[in-house]
UniProtKB/Swiss-Prot annotation:
Keyword annotations: Repressor, Stress response, Transcription, Transcription regulation
One GO molecular-function entry: DNA binding
Similarity comment: family membership: Belongs to the HrcA family.
Organism whose genome encodes this protein: Helicobacter pylori (strain J99 / ATCC 700824)
Domain of life: Bacteria
Transmembrane segments: none
Purpose of the protein: Negative regulator of class I heat shock genes (grpE-dnaK-dnaJ and groELS operons). Prevents heat-shock induction of these operons.
Protein name: Heat-inducible transcription repressor HrcA
GO BP terms: negative regulation of DNA-templated transcription
Length: 266
């Protein structure tokens, strides 16, 4: 059953009508005529007025005509505008029981990542041949040099991520790559609805998304990664622990509805 959409009393503004249009499309996923928008969004304006706005919004690149009937579809520009205005990225308390089913029902691939909390405990020098970096849960080794030993000793107490980023910044790439593998193998990653990634099989980002590495590359928020797909990252509280949530899907997936569904009620 479709929800009635309330867009306020100032219905003659383009933005209000465009928001109502996109919300209605997210519920129906069908081309929308002026008459259907008026009915479903409960708009208190005439169909003629709505058609006039359709023409204006089409000229502005927000809508395009689906076929000769005059029904319209939202464009990439309309979705981009709508999602930037609608989504929030504060810490969300998540109901773990709903996450799997909601990911499937809303057609989204979701990934939870609990970062590795390991810190560099000590640096062990082995006969002037190797330096072992001990993170307690794991360790790695690099070739010995006085300069490298001094550099690493200054990093004792830092997280594995911090050590990796600093190593990369000074061009110690072999060490950075080792730490990246260890960091991701020790991180706790949970995935839901892998079918949500099927449209990205040929994307250069596919494996970075699957492994959660895009959480390193993209800051918190909304990112448009393909012509018809987007990616959302945000911090969450899951099972009383702070984690990162990654959501990937098509532009027309109902991200608002998804976040409302998985939100833990106080």
């Amino acid at each position: 059953m479709l929800k009635r959409i309330k867009v306020g009393s100032d219905l003659n503004k383009k933005e209000s009508l465009l928001d109502a249009f996109v919300k209605t499309y997210l519920q129906t996923l069908e081309p929308i005529s002026s008459k259907r928008l008026k009915e479903l969004a409960n708009l208190k304006v005439s169909c003629a007025t709505i058609r006039n706005y359709f023409q204006i919004l089409s000229k502005e690149g927000m809508l395009h005509q689906a076929h000769s009937s005059g029904a319209r579809l939202p464009t990439f520009k309309a979705f981009e505008n709508y999602w930037h205005k609608s989504l929030r990225f504060e810490v969300l308390k998540v109901n773990e029981k709903r996450l799997k089913s909601a990911s499937e029902n809303f057609g989204l691939f979701t990934l939870l990542k609990k970062p590795s909390l390991e810190r560099l405990e000590r640096v062990i020098e082995c006969e002037k041949r190797f330096l072992i970096l001990d993170f307690l849960a794991f360790s790695c080794a690099v070739g010995y040099s006085v300069k490298m030993e001094k550099f690493l000793l200054e990093l004792v107490g830092r997280s594995v991520k911090e050590v990796r980023l600093i190593a990369a910044s000074v061009n110690a790439l072999s060490l950075a790559r080792q730490l990246e593998r260890l960091e991701y193998s020790s991180a706790q990653i949970t995935r839901f609805n892998l079918m949500g990634l099927k449209t990205l099989l040929n994307s250069p980002l596919f494996f970075d998304i699957l492994e959660g590495k895009v959480l390193e590359r993209f800051k918190k928020g909304l990112h448009f990664i393909e012509p018809d797909c987007m990616l959302v990252t945000r911090p969450i509280e899951f099972q009383n622990e702070r984690m990162q949530l990654l959501c990937v899907g098509k532009l027309e997936c109902d991200y608002e509805g998804f976040f409302q569904t998985i939100s833990k009620e106080e």
